[in-house]
Swiss-Prot record:
<dbReference type="InterPro" id="IPR002082">
    <property type="entry name" value="Asp_carbamoyltransf"/>
</dbReference>
<comment type="pathway">
    <text>Pyrimidine metabolism; UMP biosynthesis via de novo pathway; (S)-dihydroorotate from bicarbonate: step 2/3.</text>
</comment>
<dbReference type="GO" id="GO:0005829">
    <property type="term" value="C:cytosol"/>
</dbReference>
<dbReference type="Pfam" id="PF02729">
    <property type="entry name" value="OTCace_N"/>
</dbReference>
<dbReference type="GO" id="GO:0044205">
    <property type="term" value="P:'de novo' UMP biosynthetic process"/>
</dbReference>
<keyword id="KW-0665">Pyrimidine biosynthesis</keyword>
<feature type="binding site">
    <location>
        <position position="252"/>
    </location>
    <ligand>
        <name>carbamoyl phosphate</name>
    </ligand>
</feature>
<protein>
    <recommendedName>
        <fullName>Aspartate carbamoyltransferase catalytic subunit</fullName>
        <ecNumber>2.1.3.2</ecNumber>
    </recommendedName>
</protein>
<dbReference type="GO" id="GO:0006520">
    <property type="term" value="P:amino acid metabolic process"/>
</dbReference>
<feature type="binding site">
    <location>
        <position position="127"/>
    </location>
    <ligand>
        <name>carbamoyl phosphate</name>
    </ligand>
</feature>
<comment type="subunit">
    <text>Heterododecamer (2C3:3R2) of six catalytic PyrB chains organized as two trimers (C3), and six regulatory PyrI chains organized as three dimers (R2).</text>
</comment>
<feature type="binding site">
    <location>
        <position position="77"/>
    </location>
    <ligand>
        <name>L-aspartate</name>
    </ligand>
</feature>
<dbReference type="GO" id="GO:0006207">
    <property type="term" value="P:'de novo' pyrimidine nucleobase biosynthetic process"/>
</dbReference>
<feature type="binding site">
    <location>
        <position position="251"/>
    </location>
    <ligand>
        <name>carbamoyl phosphate</name>
    </ligand>
</feature>
<dbReference type="GO" id="GO:0016597">
    <property type="term" value="F:amino acid binding"/>
</dbReference>
<dbReference type="InterPro" id="IPR006130">
    <property type="entry name" value="Asp/Orn_carbamoylTrfase"/>
</dbReference>
<feature type="binding site">
    <location>
        <position position="50"/>
    </location>
    <ligand>
        <name>carbamoyl phosphate</name>
    </ligand>
</feature>
Length: 295
């Protein structure tokens, strides 16, 4: 049984095949590949973008979607993860998409399921489809020429599952990664790292990936105000200037904290393209896992 728990679950050849399929899906036309199939989404953490993206992807492939309301589910009343998995499995879905605040939950569920499990984000651990859509966006922009491209990841890297998945995936595709964050947001790493964003770092970058501060994962107050953080790490036109690069963000964007209003409307900012690409990538992932499982 194949699952997508981390980006390591797909090899490079499979990822390139996903990109080819996703490129075809960018026309947004409905398909019937998963007609008669059922996909269950169960998000124990709030989500707008990822949940909507997966559900749009499923419906465009012709699948039915069952969204479980976690606030009313038995898990909120003390049901164990094993029992949750057993009950989900008894409904005989063709795939399950799960998000949870605790790292490792999708893997635990996958061990008890008879259908593919897709990780929609677990704690600080992983967000594989976000990393895949980010690389897909980079890959398309640079017309397949991504090896050696310099990417600067800025923000709350230590607490970000998006950063963790991107670092693994982008390293495998030989991008040159630099991390920029305050000391308390910087993970232990062998990668190049800086504790303040400046013009020289941006001048040396082909891609900037800005991340949201994960205040919900902080066990103490780090900044008296997010404006203090923004003074050092907000992506602003005065820093970027006319540099030829692209700017990414997984969303939601804290405007004038992560990225300035001016840069959000700049043509180099590809946030909305990431959203469009995300549906196509998730279509490719769901199709691959479900049809391979039944083949």
């Amino acid at each position: 049984m194949r699952h997508l728990i981390t980006t390591k679950d797909f090899n490079k050849i499979e990822i390139m095949e996903l990109f080819k399929e996703a490129s075809d899906f960018l026309d947004e036309k409905p398909r019937t590949f998963l007609e008669g199939k059922s996909i269950t989404t169960i998000f124990f953490e709030n989500s707008t973008r990822t949940l909507s993206s997966f559900e749009s992807a499923a419906r465009r492939l012709g699948a039915r979607v069952l969204r479980l309301d976690v606030s009313r589910s038995s898990s909120s009343k003390g049901e164990t993860l094993y029992d949750t998995a057993a009950n989900l499995d008894a409904m005989s879905p063709n795939a399950i998409v799960v998000r949870h605040a605790n790292s490792g939950v999708p893997l635990i569920l996958a061990k008890h399921m008879h259908c593919p499990v897709v990780n929609g984000g677990d704690g600080k651990h992983a967000h594989p489809t976000q990393a895949l859509l980010d690389l897909f966006t980079i890959y398309n922009h640079f017309q397949s020429d991504v090896e050696g491209k310099k990417i600067c990841i800025v923000g709350d890297i230590k607490n970000s599952r998006v950063a963790a998945s991107n670092i693994e995936l982008l390293s495998r595709f030989n991008l040159d990664i630099t991390l920029v964050a305050p000391p308390h947001f910087m993970p232990n790493t062998h990668l190049k790292k800086y504790y303040k964003l400046d013009e020289n770092i941006i001048a040396n970058s082909d891609i900037i990936m800005s991340l949201r501060t994960q205040t919900e994962r902080h066990n103490k107050t780090v900044y008296a105000s997010l404006k203090d953080y923004a003074n050092d790490f907000c992506i602003q036109k005065s820093l970027v200037k006319d540099k030829k690069l692209i700017l990414l963000h997984p969303g939601p964007v804290n405007r004038n904290i992560d990225i300035s209003d001016e840069m959000m409307s700049d043509e180099r900012t590809l946030v909305l393209k990431q959203v469009k690409n995300g549906v196509a990538i998730r279509m490719a992932v769901l199709k691959k896992l479900i049809l391979e499982n039944e083949g």
